[in-house]
Amino acid sequence: MDKFLKTVDRISELSGKGVSFLVIPLVAVILYEIIARYVFQNPTIWVHETAQMIYGAYVILLGAYVLQRGGHVNVELLYGRFKPRTRAVIDLVTWLLFFYFCGLLLWKGGEMAWDSLLLGETEPTTFAPPVYPIKMMIPLGSFLILLQGLAKFIRDLTLVITGKEAAHEH
């Protein structure tokens, strides 16, 4: 089981670090627009949508990495005062909602991405970029976060049953 948990953590870490490089083209296209608009008085028709798509992929694909690092929003008012085992019991209950939501996102997002691909869907703008690449990020990101959620669930279950924490890689 430790090998599975470490593999999932490694996938989340590598995907997160890889996806973090999307900031470079994001900044580049925005900088290009600033220069084109304010220096050359020649704004583009493509930067806004391109930046949205890059940022969308960035946010969707970083979910698993952020989950692995414990970076998602948490209500700490009472939760932080509980012992680790009690927190794990609470987390086991909330994981059920997590799996439902992310499973639904994977399923419906996958359908939406597939339909978009088959239709060759494009944005209804002058630039008209294809939409399916960004829509494909939804099921991919959902799968990655589900996988990391499963690893967290197993760790919480192990803590509740044995009183000992399972191995973490970060």
Segments from the language model and where they lie:
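Alpha-helical transmembrane segments and membrane-interface helix-loop junctions
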Residues: M1-H170
